[in-house]
């Protein structure tokens, strides 16, 4: 299976969520983005997403203090898995991969919306999930967000992208 994000950017797939900061439809069942505004969660629910995973810290820029309640009120499951942007750990990636494995089915029964502040942290975690759990090639696992992030990526995140299964598993 190939990441459809690059096809999305070529205009082959349209999205009702393009108004959300840095939205990328990674696979038919997984979309990623930066922090949505409160009113955008209704659009996420209307697009068929049943799970929202937030990797941002509770005190991140534009964080919504009531995000979990808002998501639940729209009939979606909310999972907050905060990852410190300054010090992501292999255990964070391992937990994320485990969570995604439990939620992401080949049948596409549930759609998963994963976000952080600007979709950088999520793109890196999705890269590892797609490579290690789904068998994507390095190229196919890369989100188009990497091109946008490259000029700003620090050594912490550049190093994280080189982690192997052994690094993540401990």
List PLM regions with ranges.
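PTP/DSP superfamily signal
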Residues: 2-3, 86, 95-111, 117, ...
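Active-site-adjacent beta-strand anchor residues
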Residues: 34, 115-116
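Short coil/turn linker and secondary-structure boundary residues
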Residues: 15, 36-39, 88, 136-137, ...
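Glycine-rich nucleophile elbow surrounding the catalytic serine of serine-hydrolase chemistry
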Residues: 120-124
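Cysteine-based protein phosphatase catalytic domain of the PTP/DSP
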Residues: 31-108
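Cys-based phosphatase fold recognition centered on the PTP superfamily
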Residues: 3-47, 53-54, 162-164
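Aromatic side chains
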Residues: 23, 49, 78, 96, ...
């Amino acid at each position: 299976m190939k990441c459809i994000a690059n096809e999305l950017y070529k205009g082959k797939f349209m999205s009702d969520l393009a108004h959300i900061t840095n939205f990328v439809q990674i696979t038919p069942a997984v979309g990623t983005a930066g922090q949505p505004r409160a009113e955008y969660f209704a659009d996420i629910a209307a697009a068929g997403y049943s799970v929202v995973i937030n990797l941002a810290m509770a005190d991140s820029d534009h964080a919504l203090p009531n995000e979990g309640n808002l998501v639940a009120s729209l009939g979606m499951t909310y999972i907050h898995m905060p990852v410190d942007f300054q010090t992501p750990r292999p255990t964070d990636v391992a937990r994320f991969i485990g969570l995604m494995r439990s939620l992401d089915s080949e049948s596409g029964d549930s759609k998963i919306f994963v976000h952080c502040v600007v979709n950088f942290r999520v793109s890196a975690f999705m890269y590892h999930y797609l490579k290690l759990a789904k068998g994507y090639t390095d190229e196919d696992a890369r989100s188009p967000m990497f091109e946008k992030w490259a000029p700003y990526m620090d050594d912490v995140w550049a190093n994280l992208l080189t982690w192997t299964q052994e690094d993540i598993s401990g």
